[in-house]
């Protein structure tokens, strides 16, 4: 894989930092759950991203104060956001697509291990198919090489 993935009009160097991620995704604190893009293979429709899990995450105040655990639904959301970066890069013209993507379906979600403060969550997403404005993905989240969660995720794009 090349260190410089390309889109129609943009050349990107890996890793892709948070500034570029914010240009591609509408999410902001406290709901931006992707910190860095480590790998991008547009031919294989695959992206690998990173989420640094910190004790400073607002959800740890209530989930659970005595035993902080990242909520599984936020792990799935982080996977979807990684897929969103890949989709925006594949569709973009001059670095931004006119579509805004929403998660519309999650199937076969599995949570194998808790994600806790200090973990580095690696988000591996592959687009399985695209039908008009719908994208179907498979994602795995890993910590230290071990799959902690996986799911099939469907997103729909609407004009922004």
From Swiss-Prot:
Keyword presence, Cytoplasm: yes
Catalytic activity: a (3R)-hydroxyacyl-[ACP] = a (2E)-enoyl-[ACP] + H2O
InterPro entries documented for this protein: FabA_FabZ (IPR013114), FabZ (IPR010084), HotDog_dom_sf (IPR029069)
Enzyme Commission (EC) number: 4.2.1.59
GO biological process per UniProt: fatty acid biosynthetic process; lipid A biosynthetic process
The organism's place on the tree of life at top rank: Bacteria
Alphabetical keyword list: Cytoplasm, Lipid A biosynthesis, Lipid biosynthesis, Lipid metabolism, Lyase
SUPFAM superfamilies (alphabetical): Thioesterase/thiol ester dehydrase-isomerase (SSF54637)
Keyword Lipid biosynthesis annotated: yes
Localization (cell): Cytoplasm
Molecular functions per Gene Ontology: (3R)-hydroxyacyl-[acyl-carrier-protein] dehydratase activity
Gene3D superfamilies registered for this protein in UniProt: Hotdog Thioesterase
GO cellular component: cytoplasm; membrane
Enzyme superclass (EC): lyase
List of catalytic residues: 63
Family statement: Belongs to the thioester dehydratase family. FabZ subfamily.
Function: Involved in unsaturated fatty acids biosynthesis. Catalyzes the dehydration of short chain beta-hydroxyacyl-ACPs and long chain saturated and unsaturated beta-hydroxyacyl-ACPs.
HAMAP family: FabZ
Name of this chain's protein: 3-hydroxyacyl-[acyl-carrier-protein] dehydratase FabZ
Native organism: Xylella fastidiosa (strain 9a5c)
